[in-house]
Amino acid sequence: MIYPKIALAQSIIEICSAKGIYNIIISPGSRNAPLTIGFAQNPNFKCYSIADERCAAFFALGIAQQTQKPAAVVCTSGSALLNYYPAVAEAFYSQIPLIVISADRPQSKIDIGDGQTIRQENVFLNHSVFNANLTEDASVENDLKINKAIETAILQKGPVHINAPFEEPLYQTVSELSVEPKITNLEEFLETKIIENEDEIVSIWNSSKRKLILIGGINEANSIDDAVLENFAKDPSIVVLTETTSNLHHPSFINSIDSLITPFDDSDFKELEPEVLITFGGMIVSKRIKAFLRKYKPVHHWHIDTLRAYDTFNALSKHFVMEPNDFFKNLLPKTEFVTSKYFSKIDKIYDLRKIKKKQYLSKIGFSDFKVFEKVIESLPKNSQLQISNSSAIRYAQLIEIDPSIEVFCNRGTSGIDGSTSTAVGAAVGSGKPNVFITGDISFLYDSNALWNSYIPKNFKIILINNGGGGIFRILPGHQEKPVFNTYFETSHHLTAEHLAKMYQCSYFKADDLSSLNENLELLYNSNEAPGILEVFTPTFENDVILKQYFKELT
């Protein structure tokens, strides 16, 4: 086998192999040549070449999201490293393991005016779970840092940074290893299955007539046992609110939070106000539920997560450091159902909301809302759905999604910058049929996501083009003036047609219901190349239709 001559590069590669790191995404450069040579010629790794570092990092994020194992990104020195930052931040807040390996110049070359050189050490300090700043020569100390970085990424489910200085010459190779790096054993994190102060928690649970369970994004399928979900559904004192990205389903759960609470007045909110709020999963999309819980605070807010708990509603009283499934399997057998009208009252309101929604959708014209209804209805069963941020995820929250479909969205930092790249990486990582729904600004922002040769041929993009950032028409402050159109909405007349041609994707387009239905069928049946269906919706009608929807729910 061919190895890089530089011993430090050998150590990094051998430790990655020993730790089971498999997916390596490499961006081209010279300073990282020792790493590229070693990773690319080692059969223990699956390597990908992606030129744009921002896209490469989000591509790796998508793979790690699906495999639940760290993916590594490798880049040269200088500003290349900084382009990883959006994905590093997303990985940090979404609890996704990501290993950043950056090549650097030796310490003596930093801040002396040498080319392609920045201060790389600790550059991700505020959004990483470990930073390994290596010295130039191979050593046990460096080996321990590399081991620690990889183990921390696994145990703390977050991004780590390994910064490796290399001196020229960079391209020399050898046929035998010159090092035997030290490999440490992963210290297993023993997750507790015991509830702290259990008697007190059981007492609070059994005495509470209004228990609200709010579930955010969950990337792991079947994370909660069916028996636990059934218990939630049968308890009249429990209301369960799920976000689209929770991937948890039950007929009694409320899966369109905004449809339920947007029309509420003060008396309705007081009916929903919980005594106990239990949260688990990732970041919450719905601004309305966050505003509600910040105003109508629960007496007790318990968050269940093995790593961290955010005081999102300024009411956090207890963080249970354990898996949610373990928490409920431990707690529920010791509890009893409480006589309450909490669920029945809220469920009755939600049933009426669903009737009103069906009536409204049946009468509206072609628009973003109508398109989302038809697109989500059309999704193939047992496929995966990736959704971009901004208005796309918010529309998706309003539509029922088949329980067999897994849903993902970059809600850690909620940015539009890497949604397409993440979706492509997720399609590669999962191996499942994957549909990506995105808006025009998000798609154009990350169009380099299509600049790689790894996109599965059955990957589908449904691009909803409303001529700008449609979410700004929904938000407060919208005024039809040049400043709004130029600086907020960023109005445009661009299409994806020529991008699709350049990247050899099949291209379809629709601008009414008939062409949408026709081209959705063509899109799903076309698997010779990745497909893009671009749907053009009316810029000036979308926000009016959505706002009227919430008015007609009462």
UniProtKB/Swiss-Prot annotation:
Top-level taxonomic group: Bacteria
InterPro entries in the cross-refs: MenaQ_synth_MenD (IPR004433), MenD_middle (IPR032264), THDP-binding (IPR029061), Thiamin_PyroP_enz_TPP-bd_dom (IPR012001), TPP_enzyme_TPP-bd (IPR011766)
GO biological process: menaquinone biosynthetic process
GO molecular function list: 2-succinyl-5-enolpyruvyl-6-hydroxy-3-cyclohexene-1-carboxylic-acid synthase activity; magnesium ion binding; manganese ion binding; thiamine pyrophosphate binding
Reactions catalysed, as given in the entry: isochorismate + 2-oxoglutarate + H(+) = 5-enolpyruvoyl-6-hydroxy-2-succinyl-cyclohex-3-ene-1-carboxylate + CO2
UniProt keyword annotations, A-Z: Magnesium, Manganese, Menaquinone biosynthesis, Metal-binding, Thiamine pyrophosphate, Transferase
Annotated metabolic or biological route of this protein: Quinol/quinone metabolism; 1,4-dihydroxy-2-naphthoate biosynthesis; 1,4-dihydroxy-2-naphthoate from chorismate: step 2/7; Quinol/quinone metabolism; menaquinone biosynthesis
Cofactor details (free text): Binds 1 thiamine pyrophosphate per subunit.
Cofactor(s) essential for the protein: Mg(2+); Mn(2+); thiamine diphosphate
SUPFAM superfamilies according to UniProt: Thiamin diphosphate-binding fold (THDP-binding)
EC number: 2.2.1.9
Function summary: Catalyzes the thiamine diphosphate-dependent decarboxylation of 2-oxoglutarate and the subsequent addition of the resulting succinic semialdehyde-thiamine pyrophosphate anion to isochorismate to yield 2-succinyl-5-enolpyruvyl-6-hydroxy-3-cyclohexene-1-carboxylate (SEPHCHC).
Subunit-structure text: Homodimer.
Family membership noted in the UniProt record: Belongs to the TPP enzyme family. MenD subfamily.
Protein's name in the database: 2-succinyl-5-enolpyruvyl-6-hydroxy-3-cyclohexene-1-carboxylate synthase
Species classification: Bacteria, Pseudomonadati, Bacteroidota, Flavobacteriia, Flavobacteriales
